[in-house]
């Protein structure tokens, strides 16, 4: 009887650990559930380059995702991304945009005011196409963002909030990272978000 009882406790222990492991996996997966998608139609000078589609992780970073969604879907160039440029590009690292007020990397503002705090650092810069907030230090998120073009950028973890992922059009991002640029990494010819908005399946047809 004692032997049977020991086996019962062992089986119970293993079952609890398996369940906990499964729950952990579900939580990790839930972090990267795409709640909304937006698109950028990119032009380089007079040339139409293509479309970038970005999925937003609104469950893990609802406030940050909402900020980006609103800035991507407004048709007012003074209040969002339409007509703005990628002002900084570094090959094999990232492309940066979102400064719709100044265009140089010193401007931009969030839908909540000039800036808002870091929401969390749950997601990591662990693959190409990560969408993350650019900032001037802790809790200074506005509208500027960057998209990674490297497989891994762990030195950014804990400093920049990851809240989305490129789901289509990474070839366009790769094009942007390799355009000719000046000594300050600004494209010599403007790389512009000519059109942007909410992406729906109908747009793929």
Curated annotation (Swiss-Prot):
Keyword Transmembrane among UniProt keywords: no
GO biological process, one term: protein folding
Top-level division of the source organism's lineage: Eukaryota
EC number(s) per entry: 5.2.1.8
Alphabetically ordered keywords of this record: Isomerase, Rotamase, Secreted, Signal
Span of the signal peptide: 1-20
Catalytic activity: [protein]-peptidylproline (omega=180) = [protein]-peptidylproline (omega=0)
Annotated control of activity: Cyclosporin A (CsA) inhibits CYPB.
Function (record text): PPIases accelerate the folding of proteins. It catalyzes the cis-trans isomerization of proline imidic peptide bonds in oligopeptides.
Top EC class of this enzyme: isomerase
Gene: CPR2
Chain ranges of the PPIase cyclophilin-type domain: 39-198
Family assignment from sequence similarity: Belongs to the cyclophilin-type PPIase family. PPIase B subfamily.
Protein name (Swiss-Prot/TrEMBL): Peptidyl-prolyl cis-trans isomerase B
A Pfam family hit: Pro_isomerase
GO cellular component: cytoplasm; endoplasmic reticulum; extracellular region; fungal-type vacuole
An example Gene Ontology molecular-function term: cyclosporin A binding
Additional detail: Present with 339 molecules/cell in log phase SD medium.
InterPro entries in the record: Cyclophilin-like_dom_sf, Cyclophilin-type_PPIase, Cyclophilin-type_PPIase_CS, Cyclophilin-type_PPIase_dom
Cellular compartments annotated: Secreted
Record organism: Saccharomyces cerevisiae (strain ATCC 204508 / S288c)
